[in-house]
Curated annotation (Swiss-Prot):
Catalysis: reaction(s): L-glutamyl-tRNA(Gln) + L-glutamine + ATP + H2O = L-glutaminyl-tRNA(Gln) + L-glutamate + ADP + phosphate + H(+)
Taxonomic lineage from the root: Bacteria, Bacillati, Bacillota, Bacilli, Lactobacillales
Role description: Allows the formation of correctly charged Gln-tRNA(Gln) through the transamidation of misacylated Glu-tRNA(Gln) in organisms which lack glutaminyl-tRNA synthetase. The reaction takes place in the presence of glutamine and ATP through an activated gamma-phospho-Glu-tRNA(Gln).
Keywords: ATP-binding, Ligase, Nucleotide-binding, Protein biosynthesis
Quaternary structure (record): Heterotrimer of A, B and C subunits.
Molecular functions per Gene Ontology: ATP binding; glutaminyl-tRNA synthase (glutamine-hydrolyzing) activity
Gene: gatA
Active site per database record: K77 (charge relay system), S152 (charge relay system), S176 (acyl-ester intermediate)
UniProt-listed InterPro entries: Amidase, Amidase_CS, Amidase_dom, AS_sf, GatA
Enzyme Commission number(s): 6.3.5.7
Gene Ontology CC annotation, any one: glutamyl-tRNA(Gln) amidotransferase complex
Family the entry assigns: Belongs to the amidase family. GatA subfamily.
Annotated protein name in UniProt: Glutamyl-tRNA(Gln) amidotransferase subunit A
One GO biological process term: translation
Amino acid sequence: MTFNNKTIEELHNLLVSKEISATELTQATLENIKSREEALNSFVTIAEEQALVQAKAIDEAGIDANNVLSGIPLAVKDNISTDGILTTAASKMLYNYEPIFDATAVANAKTKGMIVVGKTNMDEFAMGGSGETSHYGATKNAWDHSKVPGGSSSGSAAAVASGQVRLSLGSDTGGSIRQPAAFNGIVGLKPTYGTVSRFGLIAFGSSLDQIGPFAPTVKENALLLNAIASEDTKDSTSAPVRIADFTSKIGQDIKGMKIALPKEYLGEGIDPEVKETILNAAKHFEKLGAIVEEVSLPHSKYGVAVYYIIASSEASSNLQRFDGIRYGYRAEDATNLDEIYVNSRSQGFGEEVKRRIMLGTFSLSSGYYDAYYKKAGQVRTLIIQDFEKVFADYDLILGPTAPSVAYDLDSLNHDPVAMYLADLLTIPVNLAGLPGISIPAGFSQGLPVGLQLIGPKYSEETIYQAAAAFEATTDYHKQQPVIFGGDN
């Protein structure tokens, strides 16, 4: 059997009853990955040997009947460290990097009995919004292989949407979980900054990065967040987990919940069919008893400019460590130390990564720091204050995840600004450190449309409550791409 139509709870029951073993489930998952991989290119590394060793150990120890994730396979984005499994960040620079430790999020998942089956493809060093900047080639959209899957967590989203795996981990710096979740018609959550440890995540923008879960349904997404969230002494920005169970409000009604709909999120640049889908979703929330009202987030229009200054500046600093000396790619044509640095970085980094390093270095340089980086920080504060004003009166914010559905592969590669604008609606959430989720809300041109719900810090359980209420009364999450197939 392929098991790709079974929910996590259904798989758990099969494992506990010993109708299947963790090894059999892992083998079936590996076959699902391999059978779809040529079409999607969603994995950089398939960790077959390591996964089967893990599965055997779990079978020998016995499935934990009280832990729904015991024996469940997990795919991990390739910028999240995995002990003994290549972690390349989809870059030539780290083509041979094999960590000797697990990221805290991965270690937490393994503690729950999850089995790492592979590392998913991504935009190089998480810099990109289409899944096309990977050194290992572009990932394809699960619904239409001529379209982008979104990025940067392209492989993690496509793998879940296509039925290669049920659950995966991604990272979100400016929308890198939510946008590919929207483009592939699945559920992706960016947690409150600090909820999931960044230890072991290859750093891009340290004040923005956050690891989060992908799943086909809201509850399964929350179950994975339960597994990975933790305070961590190895990450000074991690926070105590304030919610014992992220599924605790799932199933509760949302009567009286106040939801804000920012007028800026449905303005210029939003595809008309996407706008219509979101307005219909707002009406659906009203039918469920929520109060939906229009609000304004006046500084959100500056989000993209602020983000690309701050994120690029942080990337410029973080990526200085990759110099061809200690590990990673080293240029063979270098004859002295300066040439090792210059040639290794020039040859090891892709074009988008180099573009952002240069932008960040410029923003931090003497004479420009005040005009760019300092000013961006000041406007970031205004964006945060806009959210705080809205959340003084509302429980959640509703809007589209992306301005459009998935676009054609190679259609925006020569227009980086246009590609950057595709993150217009997700970036402000990262700048403010807030939680945000993307859930399926409809279709346009045969492609999924994502609905984004944003909450104040540490409101994940309320976000899941509203998302689950919408999911329970619609069937968008049940519709699957052709490549998904079914149980056999």
